[in-house]
Amino acid sequence: MLHRRELLLTAAAAGLMGATRKPAMAGGARDAALDRYLQVLAERYLTQSPEAATSLGLDKGARVALKSRLNDRTWAAVETDRAFCREGLKGLAAFPDAGLSVQARLNRDVTAYALGLGRDAAPFDYGDNTLVSAMNEAATPYVVNQQTGDYAGTPEFLDSQHQVQSAADAEAYLSRLHEMAKALDGETDRIRRDAGKGVVPPDFILANTLGQQKDLLAIAPADARFVTALGRKAHEAGLPGDFQARARAIAEAEIYPALTRQAAALGALTSRAKPDAGVWGLPDGEAYYRWALHEATSTDLTPDEVHRMGLEQNRAIEGRMDAILKANGLTQGSVGARMAALGRDPRYVFPDTDAGRQQILDYLNGLIEAVRPKLSKAFDLKLKAPVLVKRVPVDIQNGAPQGYMNPGAIDGSRPSIYYINLKTTENWPKFTLPSLTYHETVPGHAWQGAYLTETGKLPLIRQILSGFNAYVEGWALYAEQLGDEIGMYDADWAGRLGYLQGQKFRAVRLVLDTGLHAKRWTRDQSVQWAMDNLGRARDALTSGVDRYCSWPGQACGYKVGHTEINRLRDKARATLGPRFDVRRFNDLVVEAGAVPLTVLGKVVDAWTVSGGRMSL
């Protein structure tokens, strides 16, 4: 698929193997010097992203001051981010291959790639296109939208990430509430700045965002989640004093007025908003989408190539689904129509009630426990990968993704959290849940992330810069495939259909994302095409299309990454023959850490050249 890189990857693999054959020349003073510089970069990054410090459990000791801060949301912070990337790349250029070990070269190359993403975003002086955004969720042309912005992210962050075990922790939480008001105003200034450049979200994105903000403002400050969360945390920690009352006072005096100002700024754009869904209408929109696609996939694939990939894989997967449906007596109508009918079968429907939602949460926990004993079929690695299962908070469920994972802390103080959007149980026929769960938990995101937190083998900068979308989401989609390969669907034909439907969904995403942004598809056209091909509920598919509009390119990383991991596996198997061990291959991909696909190709090629013996 990514054939244009083959020659480069082979040469790079030879270079890596050359390093392994000369151990006396590597792993010494030059490695130590690089490690020191990477640590400097890590500390600078954390000062720019104190929220990352908290999420990773690093806001302690010498970094405790970071616990009182939120990320700076002003345009000045964007300029700081880009200067950091430029300076970091200049510093890394002082560390050529000579004298560096394989692992050191890998650390350097991954860090340089990440910094290059931030540097290359400079021509697009709107939206939120920075190193921090690329490593966090996704770059976006709209500073505030239905899924990105301080109003949506900070309440969830404070509730799930900010730990309160002492009075100092509670005071830090209160400091962050003051910061939240400043962050909202910083975003509002950028909204107006971008509007002056002709950057206004599509009308449906604007309406959804304003609707969510209106819902938040309708909640009394005393009942706001970021207020009650502090009260709960302080009570659980046995802290004296009324921290909740102090939080309410900040909400009333600072946060609600700032959110009201932001909603007014967005509302003022309503008359200018258009129904055009794609970024092609933005300044340098076509170039922006090429950058976004590169950032999301870590390849040089063009929109047309990605679109064709999606169409081809959609057809192939549909053929597999058709055979299973026919084998089980479902022969009439398109695959999408038959899957829609199966989704309405009472055997697979959860009640759309609080009790039904709890049934889903219980079922997900059971799936996680059932897959753990079978992981030894796919890995030699022994990881714990603890996971909590929670529903997406009600106050953000209208714009939130259908399912996602918050990674655990590096120090193990907080497990990964698997969130599922239970706005309606209609979106979750039972057969769709196993593959989603393997994707988000084990052997997917939680497993891959656990290698970082449980082994401590990667330097801090690599643990921080771990948001390479195509690797992270490609691995999680590959994990769904591993669920099939280790037998999780052997007695569950509907579950296997759900798995294939999920694979088909990701192929369809390639078509939709490129259709919206490169081929000028409308929102309605995209939703209808998705319904015709997937047979899933309109509500869920509309939410997905809106997501692709706000995060261009991001949804393409899943299938591009999954396809590349399989290409590398097939290539290694063909080269090694009987020496190929799929468990060792899977371990290698995890042990590489989150990396761009170009770098992953170098690692796998070097491993193959070593006869499958190289270790990281």
Locate each region found by the language model.
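N-terminal secretory signal peptides and thylakoid transit peptides that target proteins
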Residues: M1-G15
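C-terminal segment of classical bacterial N-terminal signal peptides
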Residues: M17-P23
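N-terminal maturation segment of proteins
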Residues: P23-L616
